């Protein structure tokens, strides 16, 4: 273990700053200021990231294209709106350790969880339960409970909670729950990072345990994407969803992201909600009555992205 000698003086702090390879990125963001004009020390990126200085430039470019092209901006804009969501694909794939055709930019986090649970929470009389952690982000809990009710079950019976001990979630406890009730669990929905404690969960192990019990598994990566290294394709959850306004600095309500493992890309529109953006790109604007399914994660889109 390396020794770390901490000193409580300005010179030492400045020395650490000078050795920070990422320090130059600070100048690319806008910081709120105190009344005295000094910029604040911002430690709220886990809630809302700072605004990048280039945001206004990018917004104005889109507004200019809209004014110049009108509807033709779908194909003629500097960043054509028809394929706008694809610009995020390579970045999302790199950030999440996914294949590019497994990720999609769409909607916002909880909307995406509902869209994905439409596919991956398919309860029956035997296997109808959802497992979450007891200290889950409230929106995840509300989404899970509403899905349970929507399918005619009672959350008091169908929602299983993985309890922490001394503010830590232990994988052995999860394993015991799965061993006892695995054949009744339709979906395991857990975060990559527990939002309150900061605990990084062993996602690969959780996915393996879920699959061995025949359970679908989804990950909420709101506090993980852009924060820790991820390998979704290798770990093989059925799905994952995340927001972009925390560590990705996308701004309040910015478009979310979703991952659907390529093993599910052949469902051809039979297990998800559909809309015209789920339709194959080549036939989308032909306005035909026959649905032609997109062949990858695009199938889970419903509407065009919020440019």
Q: What residues fall within each predicted segment?
A:
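Pyridoxal 5′-phosphate
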Residues: 1-307
């Amino acid at each position: 273990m390396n020794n770390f000698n901490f000193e409580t003086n300005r010179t030492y702090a400045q020395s650490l700053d000078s050795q920070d390879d990422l320090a130059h990125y600070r100048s690319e963001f806008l910081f709120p200021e105190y009344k005295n004009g000094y910029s604040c020390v911002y430690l709220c990126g886990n809630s809302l990231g700072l605004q990048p200085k280039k945001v206004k430039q990018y917004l104005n470019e889109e507004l200019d294209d809209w004014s110049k092209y009108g509807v033709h901006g779908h194909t003629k804009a500097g960043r054509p709106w028809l394929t706008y969501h694809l610009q995020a694909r390579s970045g999302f794939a790199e950030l999440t350790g996914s294949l590019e055709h497994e990720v999609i930019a769409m909607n916002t986090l909880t909307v995406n969880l509902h869209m994905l649970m439409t596919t991956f929470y398919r309860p029956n009389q035997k296997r109808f339960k959802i497992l979450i952690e007891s200290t889950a982000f409230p929106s995840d809990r509300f989404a899970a409970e509403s899905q349970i009710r929507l399918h005619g079950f009672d959350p008091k019976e169908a929602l299983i909670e993985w309890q922490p001990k001394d503010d830590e979630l232990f994988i052995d406890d999860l394993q015991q729950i799965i061993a006892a009730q695995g054949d009744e669990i339709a979906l395991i929905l857990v975060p990559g990072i527990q939002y309150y404690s900061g605990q990084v969960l062993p996602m690969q192990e959780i996915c393996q345990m879920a699959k061995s019990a025949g359970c679908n598994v989804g990950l909420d990566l709101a506090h993980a994407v852009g924060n820790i290294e991820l390998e979704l394709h290798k770990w093989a959850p059925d799905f994952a969803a995340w927001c972009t306004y925390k560590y990705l600095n996308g701004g309040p309500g910015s478009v979310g992201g979703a991952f659907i493992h390529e093993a599910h890309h052949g469902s051809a529109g039979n297990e998800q909600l559909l809309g015209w953006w789920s339709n194959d790109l080549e036939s989308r604007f032909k306005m035909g009555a026959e649905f032609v399914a997109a062949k990858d994660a695009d199938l889970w889109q419903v509407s065009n992205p919020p440019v």
